[in-house]
Amino acid sequence: MKGQQKVADIEEGTVRVQEEGAVATGEDPTSVAIASIQSAATFSDPNVKYVFRTENGGAQVMYRVIQVAEGQLDGQTEGTGAISGFPATQSMTQAVIQGAFTSDDNGETDASGPETHYTYFPTDSSTSVGGTPTTVVTTHNSDTLLGQAASTGTGQFYVMMSSQDVLQGGSQRSIAPRTHPYSPKSDGPRTTRDDKRRAQHNEVERRRRDKINNWIVQLSKIIPDCSMESTKTGQSKGGILSKACDYIQELRQSNLRLSEELQNLDQLQMDNEVLRQQVEDLKNNNLTLRTQLRHHGVEIIIKSDTH
C-alpha cells in the first residue's frame, strides 16, 4: 500500500510497520507485524467489530485485536494456540505477544500494569519477513488504521478487554424515572377482598337455605299427616320430605284409579243409551200392533194384577 514502509530489524528481533507516522512493535523476536493495511471505512468484512479505547486517560487510541478462526482450537500449549479454521491441509499456530502498543519508543512488555493486553499473530507470518500479511495493530495520536489480509484468515476479529471497558465505550440507555412511588404489596387489600367475597357467598347461601326452609314448611302444611305434628313436635325436614314422597305416591295411585273409573263410566253411559233406544223401538212396535187389532174388531183387554 502507498505510504507504508516495512523495516525489519533482525539483530534486535523486532519488526516495525510505519503508516503515516503510526508504528506497531512486537516484543517476540519470532513475530512479524504485517504491513498490508486497509482503511477502517473500507473494511472488506462487514462482521468485523472494533472498539476505541484510550490508555490511562491519554490522547492515544489503542487497538487490542485478536483473530480467531471459526473452528475449534486444539493442541494448545502455553504461549501458542492452534487455528483450525483453515483448510485441512494447512495447520497454523499463533504466537502470543504480550504487551501494550503505544508508541515507537515504548516497546517493552508491561506485565505489572493493571491489565494485560494480548495480540495474536499467525506463526507462518512470524517465521519470515516476506510472508503473507494477516493482521496488524497500529497506534497513533490522531489516526489509527486496522487492516486484515484477504488471503487465509477465515475467522473474526475479537477485542479482548473487560466487560466494563466495552460497556463504557458504548452509549448508555437512560432509564425513565418512576412517575409514581413504589408501594410494596401487602396482604391488607387481598384480605379485605377475600372477606368481602366470603361475606357475599355466605349471604347467597343463607338466602338459599331460607327458600328451602320455606318450601318445606309449605309441604308440611299441604300434607295431611304433617299439619298437626309440625305445630306440636316440630317435624324434622327429613320426615316432612319422606311423608311428602308418600303422599305424592298415593295421589298418583288415586289418579290411576279415577282414570279407570272414568273409563268404566263412559262405557256404562254408552250402554244405557243403546238400551233407551231399544225401549223406544219396542214401544213403537207395540203401538202399531194395537192399532191393527182394533181395526179388525178385536177387543183388547188389559189385565192388571191387583191384590
Swiss-Prot record:
Oocyte and somatic tissue. Oocytic and somatic forms of this protein exist, probably as a result of post-translational modifications or minor splicing differences. GO terms for cellular component: nucleus. SUPFAM superfamilies: HLH, helix-loop-helix DNA-binding domain (SSF47459). Residues 196-251 form the bHLH domain. Its main location: nucleus. Residues 187-207 have a biased composition (Basic and acidic residues). InterPro entries: bHLH_dom, HLH_DNA-bd_sf, USF. It comes from the Eukaryota. Residues 268-289 are annotated as: Leucine-zipper. Disulfide bonds: none annotated. The keyword Iron does not apply. The keyword Ligase does not apply. Keywords: DNA-binding, Nucleus, Transcription, Transcription regulation. It is found in: Nucleus. Efficient DNA binding requires dimerization with another bHLH protein. Binds DNA as a homodimer or a heterodimer. May act as a regulator of transcription factor IIIA (TFIIIA) gene expression. This is Upstream stimulatory factor 1. It comes from Xenopus borealis. The lineage of its organism: Eukaryota, Metazoa, Chordata, Craniata, Vertebrata.
